[in-house]
Amino acid sequence: MDERPCRDKLRIDDSGKRTQIVDCPLLAVCPAQAAVRRVPTAQVWVATPAALLASRAEPATYKTQWVIPAQHELDLLVADEADQVMTQFDKQFMHHEPLTSPDGWSSRIALAWHEGLARTWYRPMAERQGLRYQQYAAYHAAALAGLLPLLMRLLTEGQEGEGAGSELLGEVTADGPFSGHTLLMRLARAMHGITSRVEEQQQSHLWERAEEYFHTHFARLVEDPFGTPPPGLKLLVDTMTSGYDTESSAEEVAQDWLTHHIPEGMPHPGERLAEFARVLVAGCWSARITNTVFELSHMQESLRSLMGAEDTNNMLAHQPKPELLALVPEQPMGNMMALQWTRNPKQDRGSLDLLWLRGVGRWLLYHLHDLLACEGVEGPHVLLSSATSYNPLSARYHIDILPTLILREPPDCADAIRKSRLYFRPRRRPGHERGIYVSGAGGRGARQAAVRAMTDAVCTPDPGAAHSLLEQVLEGCDPDRRRALFVALSTEDAATSAHYMNTRTGVRAVHVVPDRQAPGLYGLNHRRISAFPRTDAQVMAAAEGSAGRGHNMLNEHGVAAIQAIFYLARLHPPPTDLSFPLAVLNAQAMQRLLNPILCDDPDADAANEMRKLAFGARATWSTMMGRPLNFRAMKEDYLRHAFVADQGASLYQTTGRGLRGNVPVQVYLLDAAFAPRAADPRDTAPDTDRTSVLVACRDLTRQMLADPGPTADPRARLNHQIHTAVWGLLGHLLDTIDWG
C-alpha cells in the first residue's frame, strides 16, 4: 500500500457546498479504474428477445444468432423486463397455429395460392414446384375434409365431458394434443384390451404386443403418409383418397380390415368395431395433416419468388435455429408436432389447431451466463431486472432465482400507490339487470355487442343522471390529467370501443394498434402510445397487457397524463389462448431442471422416474388442453393459483401507467364478471375465491404476505421480506377495494 504511485498525490477539494471532489493525477493509468476508462468507448448491443434468438449477427463475423456471439464478446448482459424476456423465449420454442378457425392458416394459404394463380394466369402450374405445391395443397384440403367431420360428429352426438370416454376418438382428442401416431397407438392398445393409460405390471406383455402390432401395421402410415401404404391397408388408403365414388366408405373398409386383423387371443371388438374404425381413419388423416402443414410451409418461400404470393405467416420462420435446439432441453412429454381439437359444444363447433413444441425456452434465460460453458467459453455477467418476477405461484412471471438486490420505491411513490384505489362499479343497462358481462359473453358477435354496451354505459349518462360515469370521473381528476385508459380483452375489442365512442358518443378516442398494422382512422400504433397526451383524444382503448409496460404517457409536467383506468372486461385470456397452459408446462419443466432427481442411489430407478416425469407433464397438459380455459371451472389449486397470480401481476403493471411521476391513479373495474354476486343486487351471498378473480387475487396475496412467524426457517423469512417489498403495495390496493 505504501509503495503505490498515487500515495499522497490525491487532491481533495471540499471548499464547495457539494460533496468533496477527489482529483487523481494518475487516473488515466490506474489499473483500479480501468473499467471506468473503458465506459466512453464501450460497445453496446441493443436487441429484442426475439432478435437475440432469431436474427443472425450480421454484418459481424459470426454466422449465427446474436445470443451465441454474446457469449464470446460481452462482459455484461442486461435483460430488462426479465419476465417478458422469459415469455418471449418460451414462445420461440412453442408455436401455436390455428388451422380451421376464422382466418386460420389453412384458409390463408389456400386463398393466397388461388389468388396468386389468378394474378399470374396460372403460370406457376407449368413449374415443377408449382405442381408440387398444388398437389400438397389438395392433400391438405382432403385431409381436413376427412378428419373434421369425424371430430364434429363427437359434438353432434354429445361426446363431451365424461361422455367422451365412451368414444375412443373423443377420449383421445379430449386429452389434449394428438397426432396420427397418438391415435393409431391408442387403437393398437385398445385392440389388445388395454383401457388404462397407465402401464400396469400385469399388463406389460400386452403393452409390448400392442407396440409390436403398431409397428407391424401402422408405423408406415405415420412415418410416410404419402408413400406406398402397407399391402393390407392399401385398399383403405385408396378408398380414403379416391377421386371417384367407391363401393364402400372408408369406415366400412376400416371395419373389414380390423375384423381380419384382430390380435391373436383377443375377442372381437363387437359394438366398438365402428368406433375403432373411426380412430383408424382419423389417424391416417391426422398424419397427412401434420405432414402437409410442414411441406407447404417449407415450399412457401420458393413459391413466393415464383408468383409473388402474399406472405401467409410461414410457420417455419418462427422456429428456433438448429444451434439453439441442440442446447435447449426437451419438454418432459417430448418435443412434438401435434393437432389440438378445442371443442365449443354450446355453439356446435370447434377449432383444429397445430402445436409445435420444441423445448423449454426459458432455460436460455437461466443460462445466459454459461450457455457455452461446456465448450470452455466463459459467458458474460448477467443482470436480470424486473419489478414483478418473484412470485413462486405465478407461471408466466416468476423467475426462480433468488434476488440479490431490491430497489425500494421512493416514499413519494409509495404514498401515491396508497392513495390510489380500485373501484368495482358494474355497469347496467336495460336488459342487463345483473350487470353487463364482457368476459365470457360467448362468441365473437356476442362479445362485440357486450363491448359496445359497456362503452355506452360508461360514456352516456344513466337514466335520470346529468353526467356519464366517464364525465364524473374525469371531472374529479387533476386538470392536467383528465385522460382515461380503457382496457379491453383484445385489439379488436379496443377498436370496437374506440369506434363506438367516436361515432355514437361525444367522446374522442384512439385505440392501440400493433406496430405491424396500419393505424387506420382512430388507431395509434403501439410504438407511439407515448404520444397519446399530445392528441386531442380523451380516451385511449388498448388490449390488456399492451399498455402495461415499456411506454410512459406523460403530460407537460412530466407526470402520468392518465389518472383513470377503466377495465371494460375482467382479466381473463380468451378461452382458446394457449399461452397460460404453455407457461405452466414450462414452469414445471424448469422446476425439474433446477431440482433434478438424483439417481446416484443404488435403489433409484431412473427409467421409472422418467416415466413419472413424462406422465405428470401429460397429465398437466390433458387437464388444461382440449377444453376452453375458464377460471370458475378450474379445480386444481396449482392451476388456479398460477392463473390468479398471473392476472394480479398484469393488473399491477397496467395500474403503473397512471402512477408515473408519483401521482395516484383510479382504477374502475366495470365487468360484472369480476365479482358476479356483488354485481347482482338480488344476490345476497358474498363472492368467494371460486366466483371472483378479485377475491381470489386478494386472498392469494394475503397468503403470500402473511408473516411466517419467528420460528420459520431463514429461507422462509427471507422470502417473506422479498414478497413484502415486491407485492406489499399490491396487497394494499386489493385490501382497500371500494365495492360500491
Could you describe each region identified by the protein language model?
Residues Q33-W45, T503-A542, M553-E556:
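Conserved motor-coupling elements within RecA-like helicase/translocase cores
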Residues L26-Q43, A47-F294, L354-L357, R362-W363, ...:
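Signature of the SF2 helicase/ATPase Hel1-core->accessory helical subdomain module
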Residues M1-I12, M266-P345, R349:
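Low-complexity, highly charged intrinsically disordered N-terminal segments
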Residues N502, F631-A633, D646, Y652, ...:
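The feature captures the C-terminal accessory region of ATP-dependent helicases
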Residues R483-L521, G558-Y567, H572-T576, P581-R592:
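Extended, charge-rich low-complexity regions and/or helical-solenoid scaffolds
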Residues M1-P40:
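Cysteine-cluster motifs in flexible loop/terminal segments that predominantly coordinate metals
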Residues A373-E378, F424-Y500:
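Conserved interdomain hinge at the start of the Helicase C-terminal
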Residues M1-P5, L10, A50-A54, V85-F89, ...:
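Conserved Walker A/P-loop ATP-binding site and its immediately adjacent core
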